[in-house]
Amino acid sequence: NSSPKDVVTFTETGVRDVTWDSSNINAQLGETMTMKDCWFAAYIKSANEVCAQIAEYVGGTEANFVEMMNQKAKKLGCTHTHFVNASGLPDENHYSCAEDLAKIMRAGLKNARFRKVLETVSYTIPATNLSAARPLHTHVPLLAKESSLYYEGCIGGKTGFSTEAQNCLAVVAERNGRTYIAVTMRDTNLGINCADSTALFDYAFNSFDSIEVDGKAMTVPKGVTAADLTMESKQKGKKTLNQYYYQGQFVGYVTVKDTPAPEPVQEAEETLAAEESEEESTPVTAQTDKA
């Protein structure tokens, strides 16, 4: 819905969120910056005014964009999520849960631009028409190598804080081709979020492995092989859905396109008919042994 080179001009929609108690980059009315710079401001700095301005630019109004957010969340299978603003500022009707945030993060990882922004530790927004350059550095300790909480394999994450929600963190780690998402919420400080996330990642990497089943990777407990899985097949139109389970727990699926039976060739049909006709017209001679 936008290009990195698009130029965004800050309006009242954005600058209204520039307050002392709201995370921001102090954007000014009439200030311009590229959409790419806006992405990094929203991600690294959690700049609420930038989130609102992106929403207005893409959706025409922030309200329209929020409706797009809700529709997307529903499409992703989120069942306990509802947005009323683009930034996540507190509202009793603005909520989500750990499972839904993990689904949203998983969807984001499939987008190359999202992933590139997610992996960024430091970024500098160049000087604009109304501001000097703004250097930004990640607020995710698990991503920052200089942090004592750095986690090997962490590729990025998103922090969040409000008095009502306390500290929340959705973070991603990859090792040996396996990717895990950890979401922790309502911790009293970010250090606890990081410790909980580290414990979750350690458990996942130490307890599970990836195996190949019918050409597709599936995550199973270490030591489990494809032979240990059970399969259930379901017909979906012209495709067969093979669902695999380990001790009743779903581990993955493979979609197989059904191959239609080949249609008989007319020439072969004519040949077969001729042969059958010849057999029917050929007399059978009984042979009697002579004494």
Residue ranges and their predicted role:
Residues C78-H82, P90-A291:
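Domain-terminus/edge residues, biased toward the C-terminal soluble/receptor-binding domains
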